[in-house]
Every structure is written in C-alpha cells, then in structure tokens.
Amino acid sequence: MSDGAFDAGRTGGLLRLSQWLSPAFPVSAYAYSHGLEAEICHGRVRDGADVAAWIEGVVRRGAGRTDAIVMLSAMQAGADLDRLHDLARALAGSRERWEETRDQGAALAATLAAMGEGDGVARAYPVALGAAAARLDLAADVVAALYLQSVVGNLVSAAVRFVPLGQAEGQRIVAGMQGAVADVAAEVVNCSIDDIAQAAFGADLAAMEHEGLEVRIFRT
C-alpha cells in the first residue's frame, strides 16, 4: 500500500511523459492521420479489422518502429540531435509526412520551453521527444512503449472520426495493439539507427496520395 509520498523520480517521469503524449498536449496530433484518410477515402480501409491491420503495419514495420528508434537514439547521452533531425527528415518519405513530424516537433519544443523545460529548438517530433525524455528517470522500453501507445491512440482516434467506428470498437483496437506495442518496444531498445528499415509501403504511398485529395479533414 502506498504511504502517499510522491516519487519525484520514476513516478514523476511517468506523469510528465504521459502529459506530453496526451491528446491534450498542444501538438495538434488530432489533425494528422498519417495517410489513413486517403486509405479510407479510396475504400481500402473499411472497418475495424482493416483499421487494426493498417495500424499494426505502421507500428511493426513503418514509422512507429522507425520513429521509436530515432527517439531512443535522441535519449542517449551525447546524441547528435541535429544529425538525428536530418535523418528523420530523410526518413519521412513524403512532403506531408515531413510536415507532420516537423510541425509536431516544433510545437512540442515550443510548449516545453514555455513550461521552463528544454531549449525550444524545433526538431522532428521523435527527436524533440527523445531529447526531452532523456531528462526523465525512465527506462528506454517504458518510453518506447508509451510513445507507440500514443501513436496507436492517435490513429484510432482518426479512424473513429472518419471510418467511422464506434468508440467502443476504437478502444478494442487500442487494447488489441498492446501486443504489437510491447513487441516493438522490447525490440527497439536494442536497435541503433543502423537497424532502421521500413516496409509499410501502403502507408507510405497513402501519405503521398493524401497530398492530392481535394476534400480532406486531416492535414496528412
């Protein structure tokens, strides 16, 4: 049983990271679909099963895994953040995908600076997040898991609004992704940037295709 004392170390770190990854944190995560909107518009993602398969591909083989590796690299002592920022840009794959990670990273850095945390330098989102998380008393696998969970949550939120899915079905998808999140989090702690590879080609192509949509709800 807790004695009521607040642990400013690990507990404080978990609370701060959860705050940064919360939908309430002003990085406008709700405005991005990562190309999912294009998949839905063209009928390639039609229901909850399609959504779950698409998101799992992003987590295991796409930007989820890749960005987690970049983020953990930014957490390391002496990390070259400018180099990692350039790498994140090279990995983005399309204009909108780059804008998504660039703008969210800039918003994260600016908000943290306004809170008295961080230098306010605008960097790609996984780099900005990793640099901030490096100051927390948290294990790398915990940071990776919470980050990947937030990726899943943001994409499910987009699907709930646009497929549309019911709220309960959306939460079943989030719960069903816990295995993928745990697997990838355990993997990436042993990875370096040399281990980066992407094979979520459908998601990458959808992100490019989204640029040509005449009517859209999401920025990407």
From Swiss-Prot:
Transmembrane segments: none annotated. It holds the Pfam family UreF. Signal peptide: none annotated. It is found in: Cytoplasm. Required for maturation of urease via the functional incorporation of the urease nickel metallocenter. Belongs to the UreF family. This is Urease accessory protein UreF.
